[in-house]
Each structure stands twice: as structure tokens, then as C-alpha cells.
Amino acid sequence: MIDQVKNTTLDNGLTIITEYMPGLRSVTLGIWVRRGSRHETPALNGICHFIEHTVFKGTERRTALDIAIESDRLGGHFDAFTTHEMTGFTMKVTDRGLAQAFDLLADMLARPRFETEDLQREQKVIIEEMKMVEDTPDEYLGELFNAAYFPNHPLGRPIEGTVETVSSFDRERTAGYHAQEFSPRNLVVTAAGNVSHEQLVELAAASFNGKAQAEATALSNDIGSAPRPAAPILIERKKELEQAHLIIATPWPSARHEDRFAGSLLASVIGGGTSSRLWQAIREERGLAYSVGAGASAFSDTGVFTIYAGTSPDQLDEVLDLSLAELRRVVRESVSEEELQLVKDQAVSSILLGLESSSVRAGALARQEIIHGRRISPDEIIARLEAVTVEDLSRVGREYFTTERLALGALGDLNGFQVDRARLEI
């Protein structure tokens, strides 16, 4: 594949990466911050997510209504989100709207007003968001389990923060964190589609200078100490729930680990699609669950393999036993060549289909820069996936699926449901 990616770093530290996609009349533009919830202190837990919300409330040049009208006029898709390791603001527009879209995004990121009244209103909105999570059993179990799995570590804290922390985010605290951490040195601008790299560099240089440049701080590599995952057995009883919700987890290769490709493929074999082992054993053959699967979350310095299932409380024991049986099967038997080739084909097809999307490409440019510090081409990723062998999957399974590292979380009307370490023996 011809790689049409260009990369420029301005004197103030801001990075601009573009990928020209011939034949398009659209551009996906993103401004990404090298900061997420894992960079926050306990007292500031949730502040990146809070800033993600509040930059929409107005800037020195635009009111919140101005932002909404301008976004609608551009006709594009506007999105913003916070993860553990980054915060992102993206917009997909026609190529003729690129300059206006960049001006809008840059204005929001560089010059937000943070008026006290707006902050107080958004605190209420985010607290309602927290309540919504508590009313969504699988998400609620995820937060409870995360806290137990990553104890006393930023990865174990909720991205949206807590009622106590969010309520403390006044103008001084919010503006201070924004000035220090949302500075140009911590920003990555990406664009994919019908985009001129030189034009975007000019736009970025014009928007992020003066005050924003003066406030720039050196990028810290401190993302907290590497986490030491626990192996909790967490059983939370909630009688009003109709379903029981189950999580089984274990450490997994990080986003930077050499085994990340083998780990991704092994997770797909176990629970990555409708042909996967878990889906077939639990849903298709026995009808025990509507939602069941497995996946891997990869952070910069750790990873987590997770099985999730929702089932009736009286079927939870059987679902747990079937899930553990599949992990034991990976450790004691070899994954077949046919299974490996199937998930390779699935992964490669997903990559190739994603190349048609400017949004997928712009997001990949940002994540690779922030997590890896370099461009990783689709060809390189495909080659690494194709090089994975059955022996690699067996080795990863034996290394990570161990009794002492396995963790479990369950939520629901769980009277009589008991799990001890011996039951989790692999």
C-alpha cells in the first residue's frame, strides 16, 4: 500500500499528522490530548472527562449556541470522548469545511471560558451520567470490578470521576489543569481524507500560538507506576436484577508488548465472534445467554483479557464452568490451525475494511502516536498478525491463564452462588 502519511511537530511541541485519501470529498479531523484518567491524581479523578464536557460550553469567541450552530452548519459528525490514556475531539466534514472545522475545534481546546455557572450545570449532568452507569448492570459491574482489579491505581478509578471529585471542580481548578495539561506539547492533531498537510500545519500554527504557546508545559511521561493487577473474587448481590452478570479476567499483553498480536487473536478464538468457542458453547449449543464473549483491553503498560456473560441466576454456575473449561482447553490442548486462520482472516478483513473510513484512519494515527510514538502501517500490522503461529497462541495461553492470576466478578440476585480459588483452577 502507498503510505500517504505526513508528520510535523511545531516549535511549541504540537504534533500534526495527516493521511491523504484520494477520491474523497470529506475529512475527519481530530485534536487529541495525551492525557486521560490515568494521569489524574485521586483528588482530580474525572477532570479530563469534565473538561471534555465543558469546552463545549463556550470560548472567548463563541457561545455554546454558536458552537452548536456552527457544528450543524458544517453538516459533520462531532464526537468527544475520554479514555484512560487520552482525550479526543473529532469532527468529520466536507473538504471545503476543513478550515472552519479546525478553527472551531482549536478555539474550544485553546480558549474555553469555563464560566462558573456552566461548570456547576455540567457537574449535575455528569453526576446524572454516573447514576445511569449504576443503573446499567454490566457497566456498573465493570466499574466495581475495575476498582478491585487495579486497587489504588488510576486504572482502577472511574473515567468520569466520583460525585465528590467532580463536585470540587471549580473554575480555578478546571482552568488550571487545562492550562497545564491541555497545552500544545500534549496535543496531537490528525486528519485523514482529502486534506493538505501543509494547509493543516498552517492552520495549527496560527491557532496554537500566543497565550496557548506560553502556557505549554513539557510532556511528562509519568502515567503512574505500572499497575499490579490483583486477582479478586468479587460477588456483589443485587436482588432487583433479573440477570446475573459475570466477568472473568486475567492480565494480558500490553499495547506495546511483542505478544499483543497473538493475544488479540487468541481472545478472538475464545470469544471474539459468533463462531468463537464461547458463543458456540454457551449461546448456540445451550441457549444459556444472549450476550457472551471475550476481548482484550490493551493499555500502554498492561493489558486485560475479559470474558463477559449475562445469564439467569440459576444458570450462572453452568456459564462459569463452561467459560473456565474453554480456558483450560486453551492451556491443555492446542488451538487448531483452522481456528487460527479464521481469526487471522477476520482481523485482516477488519483492517482492510477500516481503510475505507477516514474516521478509522484519523483515530489510528492519533493512537499510534500517543501509545507507540510512531506510525504503524496497515501492512506492518497485517504482517505481524500473519506471522502468529499456533505455538504462539499456546504459549500466551499457558503464560496468562493461571489459577493464581484469574479474577472474577459477579453481580445480581446471587443467593447461593459461591466461588473460591480452587474452583478457578486452570
Regions found by a protein language model. Name each.
Residues M1-H39, E60-A99, V133-R185, G210-H257, ...:
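Non-catalytic beta-strand/loop surface segments
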Residues G46-T59:
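Active-site SXXK
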Residues R73, P112-M130, S196, A216-R228, ...:
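Acidic/histidine-enriched alpha-helical segments
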Residues D103-M108, V201-F208, L320-E326, R423-E425:
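Short amphipathic alpha-helices in soluble, non-transmembrane regions
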Residues K57-R61, A110-E117:
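Short, polar/flexible loop-turn hinges at active-site or ligand-entry regions and domain interfaces
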Residues Q341-L385:
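C-terminal hydrophobic structural anchor segments
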